[in-house]
Amino acid sequence: MSEKKFRIEKDSMGELKVPADAKWGPQTQRAVDNFDISDHKMPESFIRSLALLKWGLANANKDLNLLSEERAAAIAHSAMEIYEGNHLAQFPLDIFQTGSGTSTNMNMNEVISSLSSTEVDTVHPNDHVNMGQSSNDVIPSAINVDSSLTVVNQLLPSMIHLKNSIDEKAKSIGDIPKNGRTHLMDAMPVTFAQEMSAWSAQINDAMEQYQVLLTKLQQLAIGGTAVGTGVNADPNLAKQCCIHMNKLTGMEFRPANNSFQAISSQDASLMLSSCNRTLAVALTKISNDLRWMNSGPLGGLGEITLPALQPGSSIMPGKVNPVIPESVCMVASQVLGNDLTITHAAQSGNFQLNVMLPLIAHNLSESLSLLSSACMSLADKAIKDFEVNQENIQSMLNNNPILATALNATIGYETGAQIVKKAYNEKRSIIDVASEMTDLDSDTLSQILDPVKLTRNQ
């Protein structure tokens, strides 16, 4: 590569080459050279959240008369450009880098410095952009900002959409009775609406967990600087920064109750990952129910038909598979894997600092994004338009001997068990067998064993 495509930069460790068109400086370049590990870069949403923090901090330092209006305005303008999605190609660093995320913090400082120095003379990445800050409080804060914004603006709306889709579908189907199943075996009947109400409740419970956690998640480590003591930061910096960010985003960010905890641990991230795990498990349950209900069309349950979205086999013509529930199950598996990684990473808080912050940032961001998309996909491409196969459902329901459970109070458990076995063995309806083995006539049995009535607690 031609020398003309590089420029020479210098830092405390000496000189090195930096691409001529790069907005970053020597510390970022050293990280680029040192951490050629993977193709996993710091998430875009995290970079934008970090820029939002720098924007708030520049304004706060100006309010506190620590930065000149000109420098603060230049820094804030550059940071806002990044927050709005510009210059993202200037953040090339691998997530597998220094565990504090110092490389990414300096990447941001250097890019903002470069952009700002075109507006005013000499905006220094450390002295001005990083004023009153340490990577040790900035990166944990950026993780919380990123997570909070994603939960509020993406995940919760997606979950609400999924819940509404479930509720609307249940309402449109109505009280169609079907075989209940426990242990994947025939059980007493339930209605579609009852079965789907469990799905809706799972999503609702998961939403409530996220909403409760937001109070903790919006506490920021900023202001604690290197070890939590706040050295080199104005005591009012964190509060003033949060005021600016809250006005812009509508969030409720505030300084952490304990800055030592906020820097040395990643408890809030671990709690968030636990919420992600709960939602992932719920989505797996719903998806697997849909897959089983859709199974067949001839050799399975065949209770519903999911929308046919694409050919299902490269060798079997006409085969159509439940691709959306399968996709969602894979999302859930990825989220569960991310949760385990986050758990291990959260254990790496030694004394005053956790040193796996970039990994936590990446996995949290990925999980939140995947879950948001999965909720939308499941709602719009599976639940919204599946069809109920009433003939199949009614046929299976009519031949379900477990309905004899409703006779327990009249004929006793032992007689009921004999009726069930006989009906199974002879492949006859429960009403036919019960009318032979009891004193109850067919009309009485039909009333007692009415599947619709059996779905109601009467």
What are these regions (language model features)?
Residues 1-458:
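Conserved, well-structured ligand/cofactor-binding cores
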